[in-house]
């Protein structure tokens, strides 16, 4: 990449781009001096791949966001065809009416309503017609009352059309030009528009673990209008932790504090589970180093109450997971009303605690469930354990107790009045029930002290519940250990 200012090689005919829209290093403070005057933007982004939420669910999410003490909802489902695949197309009358209702509902709750556009799959950055198409999209949204926008350039190859190769010094410079041009257009239409930008290198992993050395991020930091916020997911797409030092580092490169796109509770990459536990791996000390945090949660709407409310607790400075969870569960309990109960009976807090423990976080099980799994590992650590030992028998009983609690929870969930809530967890609870039942059946067999060399009589002891299919076959080729690392064997 060249050392001169980003715009230096651009054709003079590119509308909206001039030396006035680039920024030299000395014009912005280093971190220590990154812009700090903005209020923290906090809330939820519907930014996942897969089936989007319904209009009614989005209206309800606004209540959750307000109830959690946050201030923003970002409408950006990846598979809304007019956000990404057909980004040039404006919304029809019915779609526009729903967006207007969301804008008004957000305003009534004193929330920001932000709409994302991802002009990244086939955009020609130097093509005037593509910039005009983006402006038409923005103008329609402005007419609907939207003043907060996100332009997303994530999850795409770092390649450009031939015309862009001739027009721009780099891929990043093309995105800077396109985004700054859109922002200038918005500033001519409305006072104080808010724009967030999602870079293609949106985590340290995509910058090859060398954030200060990333030419792409350096160009974004130097060229992007300083009023435009930049999304960042942390060290990884889904980050186990986000440290203060890492945020200082990316802040220095971007010349602004990042807005965290929080994927901790996302599950669009793993269809086998939901993340219903509290936000973790983040300390309150990072709040002074960011301009915002929006959580991109589970596809299953009803699984997100605890994630949203514990995220709200975190941005208020509560970084003790157990404390945030304990506050969220009673607020969630009313959604678990049993049908035909007459007296508004709901599931107990102990049942909700187990539900969360079984569907906890991306990097660990719930504490109680993990302790019981550790006991199960010890029970199975020998081919033929001493099943007469008091410790073995006690552990066996505890695993049986876990099975019984999961069975009971599953049965109670089938009686919920809120069927969307039931279906959000049904496949995961079904699998948990089946697998722990098989575990107990195996432990029961071991407790009978079968002779060495005897095979477990699976056809007699359990139902034929054996998971197959293409994905499982591929996983068997490259099994992973507990940390997720691959291996292979012949």
Question: What residues fall within each predicted segment?
Answer:
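Feature activates predominantly on carbohydrate-active enzymes
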Residues: 23-137, 143-147, 187
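Short, positively charged and aromatic/hydrophobic N-terminal segments
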Residues: 9, 14-22, 27-31
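Conserved, mostly hydrophobic/aromatic
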Residues: 65, 151, 293
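Conserved residues at the C-terminal ends of beta-strands
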Residues: 47, 76, 152-154, 296
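Catalytic-core regions of glycoside hydrolase
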Residues: 45-48, 147, 159-319
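C-terminal functional modules
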Residues: 320-490
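Short connector loops/turns at beta-strand edges and beta->alpha or beta->beta junctions
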Residues: 78-81, 154-158
């Amino acid at each position: 990449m060249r050392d001169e200012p980003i715009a230096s090689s651009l054709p003079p005919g590119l509308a909206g781009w001039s030396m006035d829209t680039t920024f030299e290093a000395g014009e912005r403070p280093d971190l220590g001096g990154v812009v700090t005057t903005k209020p923290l933007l906090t809330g939820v982004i519907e930014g996942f791949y897969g089936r989007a939420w319904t209009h009614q669910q989005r209206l309800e999410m606004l209540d959750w966001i307000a109830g959690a003490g946050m201030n923003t909802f970002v409408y950006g489902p990846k598979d809304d065809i007019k956000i990404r695949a057909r980004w040039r197309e404006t919304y029809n009358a019915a779609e526009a009416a729903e967006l207007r209702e969301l804008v008004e509902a957000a305003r009534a709750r004193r929330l920001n309503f932000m709409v994302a556009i991802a002009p990244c799959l086939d955009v020609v950055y130097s093509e005037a017609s593509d910039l005009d198409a983006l402006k038409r999209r923005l103008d329609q949204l402005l007419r609907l009352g939207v003043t907060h926008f996100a332009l997303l350039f994530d999850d795409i190859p770092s390649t450009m059309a031939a015309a862009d190769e001739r027009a721009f010094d780099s891929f990043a410079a093309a995105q800077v030009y396109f985004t700054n041009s859109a922002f200038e257009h918005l500033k001519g239409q409305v006072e104080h528009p808010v724009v967030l930008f999602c870079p293609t290198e949106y985590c340290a992993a995509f910058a090859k673990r060398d954030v200060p050395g990333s030419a792409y991020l350096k160009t974004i930091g130097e060229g992007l209008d300083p009023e435009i916020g930049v999304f960042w997911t942390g060290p990884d797409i889904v980050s186990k932790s986000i440290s203060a030092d890492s945020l200082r580092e990316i802040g220095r490169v971007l010349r602004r504090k990042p807005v965290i796109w929080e994927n901790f509770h996302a599950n669009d990459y793993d269809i086998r589970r939901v993340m219903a536990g509290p936000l973790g791996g983040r300390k309150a000390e990072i709040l002074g180093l960011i301009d915002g945090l929006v959580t991109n949660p589970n596809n299953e709407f009803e699984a997100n109450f605890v994630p949203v409310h514990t995220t709200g607790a975190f941005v208020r400075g509560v970084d003790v997971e157990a404390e945030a969870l304990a506050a969220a569960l009673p607020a969630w309990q009313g959604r678990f009303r049993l049908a035909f109960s007459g007296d508004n009976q709901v599931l107990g807090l102990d049942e909700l605690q187990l539900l969360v423990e079984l569907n906890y976080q991306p990097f660990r099980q719930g504490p109680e469930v993990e302790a019981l799994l550790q006991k199960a590992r010890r029970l199975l650590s020998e081919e033929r354990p001493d099943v007469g030992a008091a410790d073995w028998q006690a552990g066996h009983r505890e695993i049986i107790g876990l099975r019984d609690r999961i069975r009971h929870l599953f049965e109670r969930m089938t009686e919920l009045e809120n069927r969307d809530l039931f279906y959000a967890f049904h496949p995961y609870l079904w699998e948990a029930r089946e697998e722990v039942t098989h575990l107990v059946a195996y432990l029961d067999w071991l407790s009978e002290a079968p002779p060495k060399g005897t095979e477990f009589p699976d056809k007699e002891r359990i139902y034929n519940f054996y998971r197959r299919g293409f994905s499982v076959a591929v996983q068997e080729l490259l099994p992973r250990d507990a940390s997720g690392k691959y291996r292979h064997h012949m």
